[in-house]
Regions:
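Glycan-recognition and processing domains
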Residues: 26-91
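Extracellular carbohydrate recognition and processing domains
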Residues: 124-165
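Solvent-exposed strand-to-loop "edge" motifs in beta-rich extracellular domains
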Residues: 91, 103-111, 120-122, 160
Length: 227
């Protein structure tokens, strides 16, 4: 009996050690190193990620649900469908083959039937993969539910190229002519975010970043510089 208890205790200790090693081995989120972001509005701000206007990418400052954001209007005075373009700073990432995640904070309005993400890829898609998206089998489109609330969607990218081939940008959002969309904040990350991503909480599950167990900074702190 005592021997069984002893072995059980040893197994529990081994499991605890393995869990601890896994936790410390996980890559910590670091702004400008493995994730970048932009907060959209009348005066957008961000780190190494910018929204860019195009001939088929026209936006307007807007307020939805009390939140300053950008609207991708439809219909609009431009060619084809309207899109919202984003450019990753080349100093962060340029070319190659990358697994990445794009986190989109959008207003869940029934004015748009869908929201798609098209990105510069190494896979199949228009213009040699420069606009790969849901229509090319990359993932499913977002189907807004009309809750009139701000929600978050995470796009998983498995074959990213991000070489500015999407009309000088790296990815874009669009309803493909099926209504206006509103976007507040966007994050681009080379580490996996949590499925229940909370834009106002630390990136991922709170983790110790040093022996004193200081937690990772929140998005609000990152943007204001406050501790």
């Amino acid at each position: 009996m005592l021997q069984r208890i002893r072995w059980t205790t040893i197994l529990i200790l081994i499991q605890c050690v393995l869990i601890s090693v896994g936790a410390f081995a996980a890559e910590e989120p670091e702004e400008g190193e493995n994730f970048i972001w932009v907060d959209l509005g009348k005066e957008s701000e961000g780190v190494l990620l910018t929204q860019s206007e195009q001939g088929d990418g026209v936006t307007e400052p807007a307020v939805q649900g009390g939140i300053d954001c950008l609207e991708n209007p439809w219909p609009y005075n431009g060619p084809g469908h309207n899109h919202m373009y984003f450019k990753i700073d080349d100093s962060f990432l340029f070319g190659g083959k990358h697994k990445a995640w794009i986190v989109m904070e959008y207003f869940d309005s029934n004015e748009a039937q869908e929201i798609d993400c098209q990105y510069d890829s190494n896979g199949a898609g228009p213009v040699g993969g420069a606009f790969r998206g849901a229509g090319d089998g990359a993932f499913l489109v977002v189907k807004p539910g009309g809750t009139d609330e701000w929600l978050v969607h995470i796009w998983e990218i498995k074959d990213g190229r991000f070489e500015n081939r999407a009309n000088g940008s790296d990815f874009r959002f669009s309803s493909h002519g099926k209504g206006a969309i509103w976007i507040n904040r966007v994050w681009f990350s080379t580490i996996e975010p949590p499925e229940d991503f909370d834009p106002d909480s630390p990136f991922g599950i709170p983790q110790a970043v040093d022996p004193t167990s200081k937690l990772t900074t929140t998005w609000a702190q990152l943007k204001t510089g406050k501790e």
